[in-house]
Amino acid sequence: MSATSLPGSQQPDLGEIRHDWSVAEIRAIHDLPLMDLVFRAAQVHRRHNDPADIQRASLLSIKTGGCPEDCAYCPQSAHHKGAGVARERLMPVETVLAEAAAAKAAGAQRFCMGAAWRQPKDGPEFDAVLAMVRGVRGLGMEACVTLGMLTPSQAGRLAEAGLTSYNHNLDTGPDFYEDIISTRTYDERLQTLANVREAGIGVCCGGIVGMGEGVTDRAAMLQVLANHAPHPESVPINALVAVPGTPLEDQPAVDPFDLVRMCATARIVMPRSRVRLSAGRKSLTREAQVLCFLAGANSIFYGERLLTTANNGQDDDAALLADLGIRVGEPVRAAAE
């Protein structure tokens, strides 16, 4: 018997804010019949969020390529020279702020900046990133950066600059992680998240579907996120973009229903987080995207590029959201609870 067909007294409260999920519980939710899962996720979403509010975030690679990490999915890794991504220096502050202003004019509320570093070094480049953050905030936009690992001091300086959120994805569950990355441990990722939280910055943290992981690995990743208190401010759900020249270049395309299931499950276990339908969305039909929105996804990356891969066109996204009667999202909460 599915969860939606249980008598009322036996219905689990899937909209409760919890931090004690087991992998088995999350796996059971994920594996519900798809229509039951989407129905329950939509109920939770409407209980905690405005379903007509979908945030648009713009993403810019401010320093591209040459990363010393060996993440198997990433064309920016110096280990994957066959991916053909040229190494570029950190962009000038003025160039980044011009891109942010253009993104705002196109309808984005959040501007995300990514640098291909293992960890930023204190000095002129980190100072430039701080200036970028201050400039983006001065435009009236939310600012998010992903720079690799952070020390507590660096997190504190980013907080002082006004950073809204820091992205540091877990990528997958702890048991599958070492199949994908050997140069940074899971615990190091968790420590960076702790440093970000301690500084009072919102946490943006999610993962990637389609790297060869099992469903239990996906549930385990969501468990780690959902058992953090508070929940992440935003949770990016990515479908692998299999880039030629990377170790995962031959991975099969992700089934769109797998993304729907991940969005729905993330919504149920983290009711108030922004669930961001992220990389790989370009491969989805309009109808598949709508299913993800119905299941609780309430943020997208807006703009024709995501770091080094293609994204949906702005005009196509604007037309889809208009057809759905969805307005541009308001600024997100500083924390998910």
Swiss-Prot record:
For the protein in the UniProt heading, the enzyme class is transferase
Q: Which residues form the Radical SAM core domain?
A: 52-281
* GO BP annotations listed: biotin biosynthetic process
Q: How is the cofactor bound?
A: Binds 1 [4Fe-4S] cluster. The cluster is coordinated with 3 cysteines and an exchangeable S-adenosyl-L-methionine. Binds 1 [2Fe-2S] cluster. The cluster is coordinated with 3 cysteines and 1 arginine.
E.C. number: 2.8.1.6
Read off the Gene3D superfamilies from this record.
Aldolase class I
Keywords attached to this entry: 2Fe-2S, 4Fe-4S, Biotin biosynthesis, Iron, Iron-sulfur, Metal-binding, S-adenosyl-L-methionine, Transferase
Gene Ontology molecular function: 2 iron, 2 sulfur cluster binding; 4 iron, 4 sulfur cluster binding; biotin synthase activity; iron ion binding
Tell me the residue numbers annotated for binding [4Fe-4S] cluster: C67, C71, C74
| Top-level taxon of origin | Bacteria
Q: Where does [2Fe-2S] cluster bind?
A: C112, C144, C204, R276
Co-factor(s)? [4Fe-4S] cluster; [2Fe-2S] cluster
Which is one Pfam family of this protein? Answer: Radical_SAM
Tell me the pathway: Cofactor biosynthesis; biotin biosynthesis; biotin from 7,8-diaminononanoate: step 2/2
Which catalytic reaction applies to this protein?
A: (4R,5S)-dethiobiotin + (sulfur carrier)-SH + 2 reduced [2Fe-2S]-[ferredoxin] + 2 S-adenosyl-L-methionine = (sulfur carrier)-H + biotin + 2 5'-deoxyadenosine + 2 L-methionine + 2 oxidized [2Fe-2S]-[ferredoxin]
- Renumbered to this chain, the signal peptide range is none
Q: What does this protein do?
A: Catalyzes the conversion of dethiobiotin (DTB) to biotin by the insertion of a sulfur atom into dethiobiotin via a radical-based mechanism.
Family annotation (PANTHER family)? BIOTIN SYNTHASE, BIOTIN SYNTHASE, MITOCHONDRIAL
* Protein family per UniProt: Belongs to the radical SAM superfamily. Biotin synthase family.
Q: How does it assemble?
A: Homodimer.
What protein does this entry describe?
A: Biotin synthase
Q: Which source organism?
A: Methylobacterium radiotolerans (strain ATCC 27329 / DSM 1819 / JCM 2831 / NBRC 15690 / NCIMB 10815 / 0-1)
The gene designation is: bioB
